[in-house]
Amino acid sequence: MYAVFQSGGKQHRVAEGQTVRLEKIEVAPGETVEFDKVLMVSNGDDVKIGTPIVAGGKVTAEVVTHGRGDKVKIVKFRRRKHSRKQAGHRQWFTEVKITGINA
């Protein structure tokens, strides 16, 4: 059984017991979080597709940890001008373990 849900402006395909990284959520590690924007649920041949969300669909997960991703370098370079600008960015994430899928 798997589901597709939306969190942080992105869609994630998850199965029960899977660990996934999401955009940062303000929930303490060890607590439970519920996602109700479920777009699709599949249980073998039984597939429910929402318009846009599945009615009564819910994905529950336990927050494992918070952290920051790898650094992404941003470089702006102007040729022949002796001008270069360099910056970096590390995005915050929340790692969750999927504990249940309900449809």
From Swiss-Prot:
What are the entry keywords? Ribonucleoprotein, Ribosomal protein, RNA-binding, rRNA-binding
Query: Which GO molecular-function terms appear in the entry?
Result: rRNA binding; structural constituent of ribosome
The UniProt entry, under InterPro entries, shows: bL21-like, bL21-like_sf, Ribosomal_bL21, Ribosomal_bL21_CS
- Gene Ontology biological-process annotations: translation
Family stated for the protein in its record: Belongs to the bacterial ribosomal protein bL21 family.
Query: In UniProt terms, what function does this protein have?
Result: This protein binds to 23S rRNA in the presence of protein L20.
User: Partners and quaternary state?
Assistant: Part of the 50S ribosomal subunit. Contacts protein L20.
- Identification of the protein by name: Large ribosomal subunit protein bL21
Q: Can you name the source organism?
A: Alteromonas mediterranea (strain DSM 17117 / CIP 110805 / LMG 28347 / Deep ecotype)
Q: Which gene encodes it?
A: rplU1
